[in-house]
């Protein structure tokens, strides 16, 4: 029994391939059941986002891995070898490490992003509802969620914005202080503007005004966020109401010029106005930045913020990798130990049965002529023989349990001695079956 992951992401597969193997939520139940019905696949969880599709599975037979690839190939109508060329596969400790890195945002396109942790949790909970999660995947995903939270808490890897839109809002917040109660004018209604509005609203701005050359598009974006749309030829009039102006159009010339801004600033009675120009080519004439009461940042200013923040995230990622190394090691040690316990108990029980049977047979053959002292000596000798015979294999098994392949040695011992551990050798977890962090594996309660 082992955990494996078969997946593809933005690094291994182009968008055309990722689209074919993207599983919308309404198909996930069918996908999970289809996978778990395949021979050798005991349980599974599927994570499907815009940048990755991953199947985490517990395999009871080696054929299970090939059957996962076959399933994916059938779903997208491609040959198995074509699918394999775009996927990666990790097993044993490396599959656990990969899951922990994914939940921590270290495997994401945007290093340290937070959305993936919620996506991992959602995928896990959905598979639980469908009934395709066994105790081993349960433990792995519970711990992955805990590790993802720990990494973010201890390293702050998600604290520094690395997108231009987020950096624009963060720069405004750092310069102006709280954004609550501020009026914002967005010039342009493209994707970047949409993302910027989302970030602004999360910081509690009072209102958003949207202006765009295509007025219907301005209306659409404003309606999406409960803002106000204004016509492009009224831009300067409405600029007088704004504390922050963020411009991102596709114009090939300056959209906001210095001369009209002089009148706008006069009407504002000395109130400062903060410009962020994230367009390329620039929307705001650099001369605007020299006007009294104006603070102007352009894309290069923002890029320096992004670069600095990305460097901070990379430094945090080094610390995150150390945390993950320790967490993987602890998880595998706890898991290996729990696998060994039923085998050790069964082996001792078998030794005790053999000792008792052979001792009874020997005493019957000797008759009732032995003194109490002689019986005690013979019984002690039998105990010592069994204890010494089992001591070395049990000691070595416990040490081997601390390796990623530990449970294989446990399986081998069960076969060699024809042992039948309780629950088939599957660890009995302490506490609630629906929750299984490492503390449960160690028998400390959940």
From Swiss-Prot:
Pathway participation: Porphyrin-containing compound metabolism; protoporphyrin-IX biosynthesis; 5-aminolevulinate from L-glutamyl-tRNA(Glu): step 1/2
Subunit structure and binding partners: Homodimer.
Family: Belongs to the glutamyl-tRNA reductase family.
Catalytic residues (positions): 50
Binding sites annotated in the UniProt record for substrate: 49-52, 108, 113-115, 119
Residue runs in coiled coils: none
Lineage of the species this protein comes from: Bacteria, Bacillati, Bacillota, Clostridia, Thermoanaerobacterales
InterPro entries membership: 4pyrrol_synth_GluRdtase, 4pyrrol_synth_GluRdtase_dimer, 4pyrrol_synth_GluRdtase_N, GluRdtase_CS, GluRdtase_dimer_dom_sf, GluRdtase_N_sf, NAD(P)-bd_dom_sf, Shikm_DH/Glu-tRNA_Rdtase
Name of one Pfam family that matches: Shikimate_DH
Protein name: Glutamyl-tRNA reductase
EC annotation from Swiss-Prot or TrEMBL: 1.2.1.70
Keywords: NADP, Oxidoreductase, Porphyrin biosynthesis
Gene designation: hemA
């Amino acid at each position: 029994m082992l955990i494996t992951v078969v997946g593809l992401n933005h690094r291994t597969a182009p968008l055309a391939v990722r689209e074919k193997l993207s599983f919308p939520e309404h198909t996930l139940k069918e996908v999970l059941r289809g996978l778990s019905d395949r021979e050798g696949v005991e349980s599974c969880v599927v994570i499907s986002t815009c940048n990755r599709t991953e199947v985490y599975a517990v395999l009871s037979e080696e054929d299970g891995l090939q059957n996962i690839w076959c399933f994916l190939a059938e779903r997208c109508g491609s040959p198995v070898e074509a699918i394999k060329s775009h996927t990666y596969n990790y097993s044993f400790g490396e599959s656990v490490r990969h899951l922990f890195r994914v939940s921590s945002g270290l495997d994401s396109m945007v290093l340290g992003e937070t959305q993936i942790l919620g996506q991992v949790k959602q995928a896990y909970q959905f598979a639980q509802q469908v009934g395709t999660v066994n105790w081993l995947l349960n433990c792995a995903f519970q711990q992955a969620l805990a590790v993802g939270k720990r990494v973010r808490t201890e390293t702050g890897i998600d604290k520094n914005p690395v997108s231009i839109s987020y950096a624009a809002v963060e720069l405004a917040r750092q310069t102006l202080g709280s954004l609550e109660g501020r009026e914002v004018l967005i010039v342009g209604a493209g994707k970047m503007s949409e993302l910027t509005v989302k970030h602004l609203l999360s910081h509690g701005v009072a209102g958003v005004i949207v202006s765009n050359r295509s007025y219907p598009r301005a209306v659409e974006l404003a309606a999406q966020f409960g803002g106000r749309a204004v016509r492009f030829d009224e831009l300067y009039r409405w600029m007088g109401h704004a504390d922050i102006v963020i411009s991102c159009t596709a114009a090939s010339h300056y959209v906001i010029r210095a001369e009209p801004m002089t009148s706008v600033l006069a009407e504002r009675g000395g109130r400062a106005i903060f410009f962020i120009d994230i367009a390329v080519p620039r929307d705001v004439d650099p001369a605007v930045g020299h006007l009294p009461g104006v603070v102007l940042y352009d894309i290069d200013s923002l890029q320096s913020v992004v670069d600095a923040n990305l460097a901070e995230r990379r430094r945090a990622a080094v610390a995150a990798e150390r945390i993950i190394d320790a967490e993987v090691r602890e998880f595998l040690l706890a898991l290996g130990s729990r696998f060994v316990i039923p085998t050790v108990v069964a082996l001792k029980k078998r030794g005790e049965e053999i000792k008792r049977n052979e001792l009874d047979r020997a005493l019957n053959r000797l008759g009732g002529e032995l003194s109490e002292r002689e019986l005690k000596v013979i019984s002690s000798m039998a105990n010592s023989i069994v204890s010494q015979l089992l001591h070395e294999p049990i000691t070595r098994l416990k040490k081997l349990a601390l390796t990623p392949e530990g449970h294989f040695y446990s399986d081998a011992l069960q076969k060699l001695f024809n042992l039948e551990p309780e629950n088939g050798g599957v660890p009995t977890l302490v506490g609630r079956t629906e929750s299984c962090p490492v503390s449960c594996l160690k028998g400390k309660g959940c």
